[in-house]
Every structure is written in C-alpha cells, then in structure tokens.
A protein has these predicted regions:
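Flexible, acidic active-site loops/lids enriched in D/E/S/T/G that coordinate Mg2+ and/or position polar
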Residues: 1-39
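Residue-level signal for inorganic ion chemistry
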Residues: 21, 50, 59, 117, ...
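Hydrophobic "anchor" residues
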Residues: 22-24, 43, 56, 65
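Short beta-strand scaffold segments in enzyme catalytic cores
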Residues: 33-37, 46-48, 56-57
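Short polybasic amphipathic segments
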Residues: 35, 63-67
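Short strand-turn-strand beta-turns centered on an Asx-Gly dipeptide
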Residues: 40, 68-69
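Phosphate/pyrophosphate- and phosphate-bearing ligand-binding catalytic cores of soluble enzymes
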Residues: 73-144
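Oxyanion/phosphate-interacting regions
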Residues: 115-190
Length: 190
C-alpha cells in the first residue's frame, strides 16, 4: 500500500497489493490487487484483479471500462426495486442511518465495491474511510464506466484532497449521477 514519493509528479503510480485484507484473512473471496495511475493528479488508468473470482477490471484513457475484456457501464437511471443493492462499509450500523428500499451489502473490499458499481450490479456504494491506494484504480474504472463520485454532504469531491491528505476527508457516494442524488437523501451520518 503506497504511492510514489512525489505526489506532485506528472505520473504517480498507486498500488494496493491486497485490498480487502480482513476478507483475505477470513478466507472470503472478496479481495484483490489494485493498481492505479494518476496523470497530473487525475486517475488515467486503473486495474483491479479479484483473483478468486477470476475477474480483471481495467480502464485506460479514452476507452470504456472493461471486465475480462467486455465493456461495462454503471446502472442506468431507473426506479429502484427490492432486489437492488448498495455497498456499504462494515461499520455503517454505527456511523450512518440508511433508509434504502433495497438491500445493503458489505463486500469487505473498497476496490470490489468500485468494480460492482462500475459494472452496474450495485446501484452505488458509500465509502467512508479510505486511503488513496484504496480508490485510485477504482476511480479510473468507475469514471470510464460512466460513474461519478460525490461527497455525502453534497460538497464537490476532488481526488486531489485525497492525494494531499492520503485519505478521504469525508464520506463519498459512487454511482450513476441520479442514483447518487437519491442515495444522498437516504444516508445520514450520525
């Protein structure tokens, strides 16, 4: 888990060799390797491998995000149903009040959460505590799949804040824009 020494460099590689450490230790399959490349402070390339699932997600400049070579896209705007789900942190029951009409799931890997939102399986995800190495690759993949990232408070989110502080300064929601707007009304920080 690290970034290059100079966060102001034109190119910065960001590596998390084991995202989802607790899942890995528990013998659960939801963990992965995450590699991102920032170009002038913006995610330009991302690769997330979920080895036990046989899934490799990636994004490169000017191309759609892919899962094992097949293009992926976030869930389209629509009405929510009871089987729809969002990803949440494992400690959400202590930190948030969530009034979501579908299901909530904790995957145990922030990288996997970005991937499931990017491929349209999850409507969105709430991410409350993360370092740059947890999100750099996922941001590139999510954005290439048509997704967005916004602060839970509604303030504009900028990855440069995470680069400077090495961690999120407030929770974020990821997904398609209309889903994020609805989720923000249904998730309250305690």
């Amino acid at each position: 888990e690290q970034t290059s020494q100079d966060a102001n460099a034109e190119y910065v590689w960001v590596l998390d060799p084991l995202d989802g450490t607790a899942s890995f230790v528990a013998g659960l399959p939801m963990w992965g390797i995450s590699l991102g490349l920032l170009h002038q402070g913006h995610p330009s390339f991302g690769m997330i491998e979920l080895p036990l699932l046989g899934d490799c997600y990636w994004a490169e400049p000017g191309r759609p995000a892919k899962l094992n070579g097949t293009p992926i896209h976030v869930a389209a705007p629509r009405e929510w149903e009871g089987e729809d789900w969002i990803a949440i942190p494992s400690n959400s029951h202590r930190r948030f009040t969530i009034d979501f009409p579908g299901k909530v799931r904790s995957l145990g890997s922030i990288a996997a959460e970005f991937c499931y939102v990017a491929r349209g399986k999850a409507l969105g995800a709430l991410i409350s505590r993360a370092a740059l190495w947890d999100i750099a690759a996922g941001v590139a993949i999510l954005q290439a799949a048509g997704g967005q990232i916004e602060s839970l408070s509604g303030a504009q989110w900028d990855i440069n804040t995470t680069i400077t502080s090495s961690a999120l300064n407030e929770p974020i929601i990821i997904g398609e824009a209309s889903h994020i707007t609805k989720l923000r009304r249904q998730i309250q920080q305690r």
